[in-house]
């Protein structure tokens, strides 16, 4: 059985392995991850939800909320979501998104948003609609190696 909950300090090491499985051009060091994990856990505007099966993490979602004039209130943004290949199509992603939406609703957010390259059908099935394109630019201290 899968349980979805907010991350605790006890999840730090196991979550690093999932974070490192996320497809990204910039690998994360253990020190950088640890600093970010602790900062996010202490930040009331950040959310890290984890999916647990038999005491093992099988997925996670990281997001945050911020105020946005266009939304006339707070917006919740999904930074990243990852589900292990062995758990795909089992509802884990849907459960993680539901947990994030609950967190956002309880925080008073007026909408939630995200960017995706390959999971558009998944988000449409959850009721999300395409609104805009996604652009990014690495800054001098964030260039991929």
Language-model features, listed with the residues they occupy:
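Conserved acetyl-CoA binding element of GNAT-fold acetyltransferases
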Residues: 73-85
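Conserved acetyl-CoA-binding loop-helix of GNAT-fold acetyltransferases
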Residues: 83, 89-102
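Conserved beta-strand in the GNAT
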Residues: 50, 56-65, 82
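A short helix-loop-beta-strand connector motif used in the catalytic cores of GNAT acetyltransferases and
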Residues: 40-50, 77
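Conserved GNAT-fold acetyl-CoA-binding loop/helix
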Residues: 16-38
């Amino acid at each position: 059985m899968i349980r979805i909950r907010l991350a605790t300090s006890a999840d730090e090491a196991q979550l690093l392995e999932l974070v490192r499985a996320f497809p990204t051009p910039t690998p994360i060091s253990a020190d950088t991850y640890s600093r970010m994990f602790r900062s996010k856990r202490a930040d009331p505007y950040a959310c890290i939800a984890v999916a647990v099966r038999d005491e093992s993490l099988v997925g996670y979602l990281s997001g945050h909320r911020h105020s946005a004039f266009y939304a006339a209130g707070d917006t919740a943004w999904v930074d990243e979501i990852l589900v292990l290949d062995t758990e795909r199509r089992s509802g884990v992603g849907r459960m993680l998104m539901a947990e994030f939406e609950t967190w956002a609703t309880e925080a008073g957010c007026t909408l939630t948003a995200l960017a995706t390259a390959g999971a558009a059908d998944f988000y449409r099935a959850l009721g999300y609609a395409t609104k805009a394109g996604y652009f990014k630019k690495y800054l001098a201290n964030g260039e991929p190696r």
